[in-house]
């Protein structure tokens, strides 16, 4: 195994040690880690406002998109001392008992974004709430519907369900719906909430709307998240 190539740099007054900038991350395009970092810098004005205040979970591809990836929630050991983090209790069960405390990274400026890009964190996952105190949940500012088609359904059927859901949301008074692709063939519909709402209220509302859609289109929609129920 060849030794790591380290490059020292400074981003907005904060020192960073970058590694293996010539490593190919996207083989088909020949994009290297340096290209990924450059891309993150270019999209930062649009990306950072969406990440600000939200604990971030990474999907990392250290050997490129053709190799295995992994999720990372806990802040990596050796993270720079200036990186802002937040400790969030992970809760389980009906009683909401805290079973673990996870220290997440907060990606809120160029330096922390470059740090994440250097880890080959090609996916940045954030919750629908912003942290208002150390680890406490703020009210939700977004409601998300995840449309995940089961075989043999494809993106075509997924788009049809998205249109039905758009109509259901319109009937419920939500005029703004922002779709985006998710995974290889899924869709997510983002619904901005203004004013913000408590998480329990948002979850109950989303489940109710999903069940209504299932009731209207039982041949095409399943509101339960169990994968074995997604029969095309």
Summary of predicted features, one role per range:
Residues 190-204:
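Catalytic palm subdomain of template-directed nucleic-acid polymerases
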Residues 25-29, 144-151, 191-195:
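Glycine- and acidic
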Residues 2-12, 42-151, 155, 159-163, ...:
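SsDNA-processing nucleotidyl-transfer enzymes
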Residues 36-37, 44:
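Short, conserved interaction/coordination micro-motifs, predominantly
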Residues 181-191:
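Short, conserved phosphate-binding/catalytic loop or strand-edge motifs used
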Residues 39, 155-174, 202-217:
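Long, well-ordered alpha-helical scaffolding segments within enzyme catalytic domains
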Residues 17-31:
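Acidic, metal-coordinating catalytic segment for phosphate/diphosphate chemistry
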Residues 172-177, 196-197, 207-232:
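Flexible helix-coil linker/hinge segments at domain or subdomain boundaries
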């Amino acid at each position: 195994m060849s030794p790591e190539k380290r490059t020292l740099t400074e981003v907005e007054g904060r020192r960073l040690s970058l590694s293996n900038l010539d490593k190919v991350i996207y083989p088909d395009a020949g994009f290297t880690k340096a290209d990924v970092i450059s891309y993150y810098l270019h999209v930062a004005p649009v990306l950072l406002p969406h990440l600000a205040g939200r604990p971030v979970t990474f999907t990392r591809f250290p050997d490129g998109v053709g190799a295995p990836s992994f999720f990372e929630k806990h802040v990596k050991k050796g993270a720079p001392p200036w990186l802002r983090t937040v400790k969030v209790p992970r809760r389980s069960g009906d009683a909401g008992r805290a079973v673990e405390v996870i220290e997440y990274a907060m990606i809120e400026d160029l330096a922390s974004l470059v740090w994440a890009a250097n880890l080959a964190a090609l996916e940045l996952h954030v919750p629908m709430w912003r942290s208002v105190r150390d680890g406490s949940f703020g009210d939700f500012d977004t409601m998300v519907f995840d449309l995940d088609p089961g075989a043999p359904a494809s993106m075509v059927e997924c788009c049809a369900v998205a249109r039905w859901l758009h109509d259901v949301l319109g009937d419920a008074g939500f005029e703004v719906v922002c779709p985006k692709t998710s995974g290889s063939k899924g869709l997510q519909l983002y619904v901005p909430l203004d004013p913000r709402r408590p998480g329990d209220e948002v979850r109950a509302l989303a489940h109710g709307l999903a069940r209504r859609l299932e009731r209207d289109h039982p041949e095409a929609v399943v509101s339960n998240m169990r994968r074995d129920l997604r029969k095309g």
